[in-house]
């Protein structure tokens, strides 16, 4: 008989009991997000969801995303309560731009060693994001992978499926010269540009935990959860029918994201002087000596969503958005793109 000790999964660094404890902790979170179309609870091999009633030609829309290196900042600060909302926002905001209503969401949480408290905090944030978006958290995967991640470090990915009526898909094809562009404010950098942000903080030797801007801790400004625009935008679409295109301003800023929803011959003319850039962006620009054009190519600079409507629909759209609790403003207009011209022209860029 071998004298070698009997090895278990736990000896290899995987704690099945911890995984089961996490599932029990998060069942209530998932239940709070339940939509009537979702069939069954957590724990099955697959999650089932009916198409909501009332759709004539339903088209499913899917998306997946992560939160980039904002996660590294969350880990360094031991702040895990809002990163889940970031994850949901990055997915559902991408879905809503084509007019889709998010139906359900799944998450993937991978870690070297599962900390049940941290994971439960993250998933609670995911649940809060799902509630804000009106979609169900129907399942996910928690992978404890010793040797793949350092200690209790973790990575996140999100997956979302939504539905839109085929005849009501918003694809930018109706955008025309003279149309107006309306902006919705971001809460901060959202979930993009954090590799640059972290480099700026490192090179400038900023004491992030003891720095305040306008009386607010820099950590709070940088970790502010990504805004979820789903409900105000779906209300705008339903009540006005005015929306021709929408762009979620993520990595690539205004310069790279607006062209994704424009016809080839259209140019977005954006007046950078039309809004007061939040102080956190000016702080980052100054500390990193970042070129103004680079700021708009990497960061959202205070704009989280851009909406295109006809000029005669501007007031109705602004009023509808304000009624939904938003603070919209007209950020620019659509012009005809000259041959070879960029699809976004930024006017009134400040000299730096």
Swiss-Prot record:
EC number, as in UniProt: 6.3.3.1
Gene3D superfamilies linked to this entry: PurM-like C-terminal domain (3.90.650.10), PurM-like, N-terminal domain (3.30.1330.10)
Signal peptide feature range: none
Cell location: Cytoplasm
Catalytic function, reaction form: 2-formamido-N(1)-(5-O-phospho-beta-D-ribosyl)acetamidine + ATP = 5-amino-1-(5-phospho-beta-D-ribosyl)imidazole + ADP + phosphate + H(+)
GO biological process: 'de novo' IMP biosynthetic process; adenine biosynthetic process
Pathways involved: Purine metabolism; IMP biosynthesis via de novo pathway; 5-amino-1-(5-phospho-D-ribosyl)imidazole from N(2)-formyl-N(1)-(5-phospho-D-ribosyl)glycinamide: step 2/2
Keywords assigned by UniProt, alphabetized: ATP-binding, Cytoplasm, Ligase, Nucleotide-binding, Purine biosynthesis
Transmembrane stretches, start-end: none
Any matching Pfam family: AIRS_C
Record's GO cellular component terms: cytosol
Single annotated GO MF: ATP binding
SUPFAM superfamilies: PurM C-terminal domain-like, PurM N-terminal domain-like
Keyword Nucleotide-binding: yes
HAMAP family per the UniProt record, alphabetical: AIRS (MF_00741)
Protein family membership: Belongs to the AIR synthase family.
This protein's name: Phosphoribosylformylglycinamidine cyclo-ligase
């Amino acid at each position: 008989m071998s004298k070698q000790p009997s090895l278990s999964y736990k000896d290899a660094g995987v704690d099945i009991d911890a995984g089961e404890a996490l599932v029990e902790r998060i069942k209530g979170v998932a239940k709070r997000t339940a939509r009537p179309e979702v069939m069954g609870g957590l724990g099955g091999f697959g999650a089932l969801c009916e198409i909501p009633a009332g759709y004539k030609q339903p088209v499913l829309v899917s998306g997946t995303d992560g939160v980039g290196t904002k996660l590294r900042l969350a880990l360094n600060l031991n702040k895990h309560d809002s990163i889940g909302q970031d994850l949901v926002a990055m997915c559902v905001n991408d879905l809503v731009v084509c007019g889709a209503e998010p139906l359900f969401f799944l998450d993937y949480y991978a870690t070297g060693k599962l900390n049940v408290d941290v994971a439960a905090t993250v998933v609670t944030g995911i649940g809060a994001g799902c509630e804000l978006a009106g979609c169900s958290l129907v399942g996910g995967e928690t992978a404890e992978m010793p040797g793949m991640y350092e200690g209790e470090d973790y990575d996140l990915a999100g997956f979302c499926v939504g539905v839109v009526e085929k005849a009501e898909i918003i694809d930018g094809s109706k955008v025309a010269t003279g149309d107006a562009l309306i902006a919705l404010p971001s809460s901060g950098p959202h979930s993009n540009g954090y590799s640059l942000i972290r480099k700026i903080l490192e090179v400038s030797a900023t004491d992030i935990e003891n720095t305040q801007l306008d009386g607010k801790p820099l950590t709070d400004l940088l970790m502010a959860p990504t805004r979820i625009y789903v409900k105000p935008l779906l209300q705008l679409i339903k009540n006005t029918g005015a929306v021709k295109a929408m762009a979620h301003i993520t990595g690539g800023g205004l310069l790279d994201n607006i062209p994704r929803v424009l016809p080839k011959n259209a140019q977005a003319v954006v007046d950078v002087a039309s809004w007061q850039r939040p102080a956190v962006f000016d702080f980052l620009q100054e500390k990193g000596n970042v070129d103004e054009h680079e700021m708009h190519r990497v960061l959202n600079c205070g704009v989280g969503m851009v909406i295109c409507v006809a000029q005669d629909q501007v007031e109705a759209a602004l009023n509808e958005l304000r009624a939904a609790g938003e603070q919209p403003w007209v950020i620019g207009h659509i012009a005809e793109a000259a041959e070879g011209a960029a699809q976004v022209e930024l006017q009134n860029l400040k000299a730096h």
